[in-house]
């Protein structure tokens, strides 16, 4: 077998060697069956045999009815499959009754397709990721997740390749088969590896292991120990759409994907979005990356021009602030509208540095959160008056008087959260 070496896709049912009392995994196409009631405990029913799949290993329980009674849940307990009936209505079943079980065809079909799709996706990951391992699996109403451990995080390109390879495996109509082996026999299958946790106890001795093979026996797409229900050919899966990825833990990449209507809607939505974007950018869909790159470059240039223009505007506002003499130094003090403190650092420093008659500047920002910035001419330039001013000390005095907090150095400091009218703060600075 040419399955790329990787940790086998294993069910979460580590307590059981992937065998179940249900006949569903062995005969997944059965939707109606006859059985005898063995035991009834309140609303829980045990049959002599069942084709209902019990919730296990990330695959949800089958839905359906037992002689018209809605089955609300199915679990395996003490090597028995227990059917929990819905709470509405009386349970008129008794031990010895011959009953008919009906399995919800749509939901079983969805789960089988989704479960096989997860094996197909894992097979694709075998061909794209190094040091691949399996960390979890779950089927929900609209999507499936597979948790992979990889040497490096999976990127966008990896997801695209996973989706491409998985859909190619679907198109290639690969057979899907399953067989039961002893644990020792299973270990000898090329390309299959057992999780250490699985090997401890449950996988020892002559325990039976159910092995699912996707593809031809001599050259399979994937080989996995699994107890779920599956389709008999990958063509039955239909389109596979990768939805997103996340990182739930160190070294783990969670890949979420969809099959069926959700996948069709996702792929159609992506195509529609691409067409809309292409129309907006006057480009072909295949040329979108280049068109977006050009647009991004243009946006970056415009943003830089806007920053420069705004800095010039703020500088002009600061140079228009009224000046006053405070302790022998020439100050520009006033309020500034529509500005953020970080935006004023360079314009304020430039304003005091370019005016030989100005020693310091204090600008009070208006708005819901008043702030103050103070810039002082560098004393190294020979300004004796500026040498007596410490911007950080001035901001500290402002926050002591009006609340808030801040800090900085001798030539520039800022403070925010002032609990006062900006004009009152500016007046206090002029008079201090």
Q: Which sequence ranges carry the predicted segments?
A:
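A glycine- and charged-residue-rich anion-binding loop/surface
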Residues: 2-432
